[in-house]
Design a protein with these regions (language model features):
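Acidic/polar active-site rim loop that often engages polyanionic ligands
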Residues: 64-72, 155-166
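Conserved N-terminal Rossmann-fold NAD(P)-binding element of oxidoreductases
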Residues: 32-34, 57
Length: 241
């Protein structure tokens, strides 16, 4: 098996997945919305697998509270847009990656236009607020797009209880419950693969807030839990492409 210098970094992946699968990954275009604790890890694992085109979306900047768990967050990146920090990493990982960077808050009315702007082979939903999350899910399913979604990783710590199920089979997850309720009101009851945890959330790890956009509470998190959720999402995308 011969490799050019540019493709040498993919040798181990090709050895496992095979040449045909690698070519499918190179041709694929994956949209990742939400680049926090879960989404950034999902996006990087997808990038490292050799996906050829990606669009990443997140308006947030790196904050001190992100450093305990988020991939783009270190002291030297404080105040910088997460999407831009990750774009630098991804282009350094794969210089041939065709990357579209959108450091914007994805408002509900902008979602249909984004999904119609090009042909996405997979959509990764790692949004942590209910309204835009549900609009993305709704419009992706309406268009017949492949989509996988992350439910809540906060206030939980046991990675052995992480599962992949259909959204309508989730339990012990406040975000899942809110998403189901909103989608039902929107008339959407199609199947949706999600990663969630069967672990009951620790109520003492949740506090009410009123200073964050579209958020009513903040949940305690630990370094590894969102990362594992993100890896679950990436594995699903890579397996299904």
């Amino acid at each position: 098996m011969e490799h050019t210098d540019r493709s040498a970094w993919q040798q181990r992946t090709e050895l496992l997945l095979g040449e045909e699968k690698m070519e499918r990954l190179r041709r694929a275009h994956v949209l990742v919305v939400g680049l926090g604790g879960v989404g950034a890890y999902a996006a990087e694992m997808i990038c490292r697998a050799g996906v050829g085109r990606m669009t990443i979306v997140d308006a947030d900047t790196v904050q001190p509270s992100n450093i305990n768990r988020q991939l783009p967050a270190v002291h030297s990146t404080l105040g910088r847009p997460k999407a831009e920090v990750l774009a630098e990493r991804f282009r350094d990982i794969n210089p041939e990656l065709e990357l579209t960077v959108m450091p914007v808050y994805l408002k509900d009315e902008a979602i249909p236009a984004l999904l119609d702007s090009t042909q996405f082979d997979f959509v990764v939903d790692a949004i942590d607020t209910v309204a835009p999350k549900c609009y993305l899910i709704y419009h992706a399913l309406q268009r017949g797009l492949k989509i996988v979604s992350s439910m809540g990783a906060g206030a939980k710590r046991d990675i052995t209880q992480i599962r992949f199920v259909d959204l309508w089979e989730t339990y012990h997850c406040g975000l899942s419950k809110a998403v189901r309720k909103r989608l039902q009101k929107m008339g959407m009851k199609r199947r949706l693969p999600v990663v969630f945890s069967t672990e009951q959330a620790d109520p003492s790890a949740v506090i009410l807030v009123d200073d964050e956009q579209n958020k009513k509470s903040t949940a305690g998190t630990v370094s590894y839990m969102p990362a594992v959720f993100g890896c679950y999402l990436a594995e699903y995308v890579i397996r299904k492409l």
